Regions:
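N-terminal presequence-like segments and the immediate start of the first folded domain
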Residues: 1-65, 71-121
């Protein structure tokens, strides 16, 4: 199967695709929302972007298999985790996840969320 771009019409600030799909596997670039407000609002806005990209790829959050969360301050973990947990509240098997602090995130974001999904998950 050929490589398919997801969200090719989205504005980006570098040489990358918002998402790529090959053989039923979907990789999404890190999603940020630095203008959304506090950590909870940025987390929700980033997850909303992920939902839109997943839909464009023909899947939902129920098919997400791995998530990576980067925080500009690990002390924001609990606030991010509350929003993240609510997003997954109806998902039977949550994805594997890594979460850690990064020295700085693009555009001054407080959180960046990367996701992978599979059509057959």
């Amino acid at each position: 199967m050929a490589k398919e771009g997801i969200g090719a019409d989205w504005p980006v600030f570098g040489p990358y695709s918002p998402g790529v799909k090959v053989d039923g596997i979907i990789w999404l670039a890190g999603q940020i929302a630095p203008d959304a407000g506090d950590i909870a609002e940025q987390t929700q806005a980033s997850l909303d972007k992920i939902d839109v990209l997943l839909a464009a790829a023909g899947v939902t959050k129920h098919q997400v298999t791995f998530v990576q969360v980067l925080l500009d301050d690990i002390n924001n973990f609990a606030a991010m985790n509350d929003v993240y947990g609510a997003w997954l509240s109806d998902v039977e098997i949550p994805p594997a996840r890594a979460a850690f602090e990064a020295a700085a995130l693009p555009r001054g974001a407080a959180v960046e969320i990367v996701a992978q999904a599979h059509e057959d998950a």
